[in-house]
Each structure stands twice: as C-alpha cells, then as structure tokens.
Amino acid sequence: MGREFELKYGATPDILAVIRTEFGGFSPISMETTYFDTHSGALSTKRMTLRLRKENGTAVCTLKTPGDDLGRGEWEVLCDDIQKAIPLLLEAGCPEELNTLAATGIKPVCGTRFTRLIRDILLPGGRAELALDQGVLTGGGREAPLCEIEVECKEGPEAATAAFAQKLAARYNLIPEERSKFRRAIDLTRGEENG
C-alpha cells in the first residue's frame, strides 16, 4: 500500500509570492484534475477519492482512501482513462472495494485547474516537498479560487515533515486546511461552497 502524509494550509496569493521569493528554486507543474464518483456517491460516502490528473500533460490516475491522522492510503498508475486505470490500481494493491463500487458505473463530478510550484526541502533524516498551489476548483458549473500550501513527506520520518510544516505555518500565520481539494470541489458542485 502507498501511504501519503501531508499537511495543507490555506493561503493568499500574496503569501505564496512571499514564500516563493524567500525559498526560491521552485519548479512549475500545470495540473488539471477530474474527480470521479459512482452515480450514488458511494466513493465519496466512504471517503475514497478517485481522480485522473494531468501533470504537465502526463495522465496519472489515483485512488486515495481514509487513513489515520494526517496519513492516508494512496495508489497511483500512469493511465489516461479512468476505466482502464481501475484494474491497474487493483494490481497496484488498492482495496478490492474500488472494483465493487465502480462496477455500478462512475462519472466525473468535479475538478481543479491550478499551477503547482514545487521545491524539495531537506530535513533531518529525510525530505519533504513544499508545494504552492494556485488556480480554481470546478463543480456544478461554478468555479472557486484555490490557493493553498502543501507540505508532503517524501522520505524519512513524518515527524520531521510535521515539524517543518508547523514552523512554516507559524512563520507565515497559515491556517490548516482541513478539507481536501476534492471535498471543496464536491461541495461547490452541491452548491455548498461560498468561494
């Protein structure tokens, strides 16, 4: 099983600009994501996220499942078709439940379009990725601004990543973002997001 450990913070364009200048060395990635669910919303109900994301034109299909604390299950495969990706995700070790739920049919429900600026941060015994995301959430024929910071553990102890993220949050007065991009985009689809 893949495991993802990350911390997210809401931000403003001004804060992103300051961090970009102070840290330097960022590389841009153009991201366009489509999130999928069953017609009954079963994946969302089970807090599972199924997406197809184009990262600088490369298609990556991902399943995320609930986990403990700030971690969660994550499986990714290179594929440009979500239906073809499901058996590949199963081969990669994702829960068989995906196959059962998706057998009833899946549909696109919401999405995102944003630019991600990434930079590696060397930490004691490991490495984190600092990501600055700016763009839009899409859903229900509406758009809402997206501006956030992610700190993801890439290797080494999660505690080192958490400590770096906490220092970053304190330095720039960042507020933790409890909801995923998917959750905010699906709320927008349902008319529950006020931007």
Task: Pin down the residues of each PLM region.
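Phosphate-end processing signature that detects enzymes handling 5′-triphosphorylated RNA
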Residues: 1-195
